[in-house]
Regions:
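Transmembrane alpha-helical segments of polytopic membrane transport and secretion proteins
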Residues: 1-35, 280-318, 551-567
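Membrane-water interface segments at the C-terminal ends of transmembrane alpha-helices
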Residues: 28-59, 71-182, 210-231, 262-280, ...
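A short amphipathic helical element positioned immediately N-terminal to and/or at the very start
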Residues: 63-72, 346-355
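Glycine/proline-centered hinge or cleavage motifs at structural transition points of membrane proteins
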Residues: 195-197, 209, 469-471, 483
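Juxtamembrane inter-helical linkers in multi-pass membrane proteins
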Residues: 198, 286-303, 340-354
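Glycine-rich helix-loop "coupling/hinge" segments at transmembrane-helix boundaries
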Residues: 230-254, 339-343, 504-531, 565-567
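Helix-loop-helix hairpin linking two adjacent transmembrane segments in secondary transporters
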Residues: 245-270
Length: 567
């Protein structure tokens, strides 16, 4: 038997070991928090500040506003064009989005499934695909305008830009509005029906007022996205130019960072103003729809019973869905068709061309997307936990900063990274790291929101109970929080992968010529008029993303079935 002295010695040794482990765990916890907050300041706030500082730099190195006057004189028309297109695009896109969302929320059976599939394909497709399909369908030699209607129209104008931007913004807006509609209180709709209200009255007096804040959010987001879009005006704008397109040409053609920074300020300032309006509207929307129903139930409303408003929305959404089907059908077919004297035949020559010049870029795109998906998801989970549960000082400020990239134009965020990380001690330009960091923090707002929503389902009492039983902060994070965030991990992974495969605006200035990505091969092919190759690249990107999303769906469904079988 051990002596009392030996037992006491072992106890003291174990106690000192526990104290040392606790100190190390607390230090690691503080280090994680410091890295999270420092990364947000470094990779979000600092690039934005660099744009503002560079735009105010005068010829003598002092502070000067002269560059803003130069921009207004030289690019005043482009600025007016941007506002013109933004307003029309925002209104048209919001009307189409609201119509499509109501159709999706009220449809039944296979109709609802079909609408959701079309929306999903449109959401995960790469940029520039709308412009590509627009040229092939409605161009001077378009399938519809020329071959079917025998018309030779000039599609390169402002109205083409407005139409394509509006259609490309609808899927994301409509899915957002569908989520809001699914949260409406069924009791309010049922009470109105019991009191004799018609479908049209319920839609006009209950549904539309409840989703008005969310509708205004779509309006703001569409306007900001239109301001930031450079690809559509460059490809189908013709002589019509916008400020975002001029920024792209200014950086790529002249490398004038001072002027491009000043030009970006005209996009950055309204975006930041709209950002705070967006946050206020989202809080109001949450108050109107929070005490509602589960997302799996159907909206108890039928649009055909809603009078002229309902039928009008059905007509608009039908036009939208038909255009989307035509658009993607055209793109998928064009990659395997060859025209000879007006006769089309099946061919694989573009596939061989893609394999020769684009296989490495496609693999690199997948590699980057996987890295950003894993790293970005872990970062978002940690950031959401520390902001939501730890209640640190300045939490509101850091949460606001982390959400800011959601509203920033891609060109602003990209040029900000060039200015911020183009010199010692943190020179990242020309490396893959700057591209990965830009992708990660551009997608951080949505990833954090997904994780925060999952955290809301985890009672804080479980964390407190674990702490009361002696678990350290990191042990609680590892054994309690992370397992509860497993569904959020998969959702964030899919979102980050999809966004990384299809992003263009924020990283177009950061890509090294030796490290091209597939989405920029697509842009080059469209810009150079190689539409068949562009169609094939777009199809491959879309199929890769859909495969990843399908795999994630199967994993989620298998996990749900396993939990049901256990119960």
């Amino acid at each position: 038997m051990k002596s009392a002295g030996a037992i006491q010695k072992n106890t003291e040794k174990r106690a000192s070991h526990d104290v040392l482990f606790s100190l190390c765990e607390n230090a690691a916890d503080k280090l994680i928090l410091l890295v999270l907050l420092g990364s947000v300041l470094l990779f979000i706030l600092w690039p934005i500040a660099c744009i503002a500082l560079r735009s105010l730099r005068g010829a003598d190195g002092g502070v000067s506003f002269a560059m803003f006057g130069t921009v207004l004189r030289q690019y005043g028309e482009s600025l007016r064009n941007s506002v013109f297109v933004g307003v029309f695009t925002a209104v048209l896109s919001t009307i189409l989005s609201l119509s499509a969302a109501l159709v999706c929320a009220t449809a039944r059976g296979w109709k609802k499934t079909l609408c959701m599939i079309i929306m999903l394909v449109a959401m995960v497709s790469p940029p520039f695909i709308s412009s590509l399909a627009y040229i092939q369908l409605y161009g001077r030699r378009g399938w519809i305008t020329y071959r079917l209607l025998h018309l030779s129209l000039n599609p390169y104008n402002r109205w083409g830009v407005i139409l394509m931007q509006s259609i490309s913004f609808v899927p994301l807006n409509a899915m957002f509005l569908s989520g809001i509609l699914e949260k409406l209180d069924e009791g309010s709709l049922r009470s109105a029906r019991d009191l004799g209200a018609s479908g049209g009255v319920i839609l006009r007096d209950i549904v539309l007022p409840l989703i008005r804040p969310a509708t205004l959010v779509c309006l703001l987001l569409s306007f900001v996205r239109s301001l930031a879009d450079f690809g559509t005006p460059i490809i189908i704008g013709g002589r019509f130019s916008t400020l975002a397109a001029d920024i792209y040409l200014q950086v790529v053609g002249y490398s004038d960072l001072e002027k491009s920074s000043a030009m970006n300020m005209f996009l950055l300032i309204p975006s930041i103003i709209f950002f705070f309006i967006y946050r206020a509207l989202m809080r109001r929307s949450d108050r109107l729809t929070d005490a509602s129903r589960t997302a799996q139930t159907e909206l108890g409303l039928l649009l055909p019973h809603c009078g002229a408003i309902g039928w009008g929305m059905i007509a608009l959404s039908t036009v939208f869905f038909v255009m989307i089907v035509l658009q993607y059908g055209c793109v998928f077919l064009s990659g395997f068709l060859k025209s000879a004297k007006g006769v089309y035949s099946f061919t694989l020559q573009y596939w061989d061309q893609l394999w020769r010049i684009g296989s490495s870029t496609m693999l690199r795109s997948v590699e980057y997307a996987l890295i950003v998906s894993i790293a970005g998801t872990v970062f978002a989970m940690l950031f959401a936990y520390y902001m939501d549960r730890r209640r640190i000082i300045g939490r509101s400020l850091f949460d606001c900063l982390a959400t800011l990239p959601y509203m920033l134009p891609g060109t602003c965020f990209g040029i900000g990274y060039i200015l911020a990380f183009n010199h010692a001690p943190l020179k990242l330009t020309g490396t893959a790291l700057i591209v990965l960091a830009n992708m990660l923090f551009k997608q951080l707002p949505t990833s954090t929101k997904i994780c925060t929503a999952s955290l809301a389902l985890l009672p804080e009492v479980q964390e407190r109970s674990a702490r009361d039983l002696g678990a350290g902060r990191l042990a609680v994070l590892r054994d309690v929080v992370f397992p509860a965030l497993r569904p959020a991990f998969l959702s964030c992974f899919v979102y980050n992968f999809t966004s990384s495969m299809t992003t263009a605006g924020s990283i177009i200035f950061l890509i090294d010529a030796k490290r091209q990505l597939a989405v920029f091969k697509l842009f080059d092919a469209v810009y150079q008029g190689d539409y068949a190759l562009a169609s094939l690249i777009a199809s491959v990107i879309t199929v890769i993303v859909l495969l990843v999303e399908g795999l994630a769906f199967l994993i989620t469904r298998k996990g749900e079935n396993r939990r049901v079988s256990r119960t």
